[in-house]
Amino acid sequence: MNLTEDQFLEAELINFQLTMDNPDFVALAQEVSDYCKKFKPESVLDFGCGTGVYSEIFRREGYNITAQDKFKSHRDYCKEKHPLLKVYQKPREAALMLWIEVAEHMTDQEISKALEVVMPRIILFSSTPNKTEFDEDWGHINIKSENEWIDMFTDFGYELIEKPQTPTLWALTFQKI
């Protein structure tokens, strides 16, 4: 059973408390924002922005940030809770791409298409590294090991430059070669 997009949003809000009301999650988003400053990106895309917390923190820090999510319920939530954000269904070109816990929901073909559209110079990437009994419910269709992700991004013309351990212990930062 796959969660509907409304159930997915409800789980993020209630079960995981991925909101601006959760000081720990806000602090994590701030940590990610601080980490990304060294790249001096002209623009940032929060790809699969979910509840928009990363986007809102980046906006408050002065980044030129765009929030993107394919789910209408997530976009509507972001527009209501973060009215100053630019929120879109389709991705936009950006210098830095936040790709946090989204790729496991995508096929390799969708990943390739996203990279063609966004054309990021830097990618802060994190994707669930292990298979679980909950993958099907959460729509996890593409679980890869760290080395498999690194190989895939290498094939797309990126090199691994850091393992920042933020926002997750398995996060990776890639740079266009």
Residue ranges of each PLM-predicted region?
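Conserved beta-strand signature within the Rossmann-like core of class I S-adenosyl-L-methionine
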Residues: 120-133
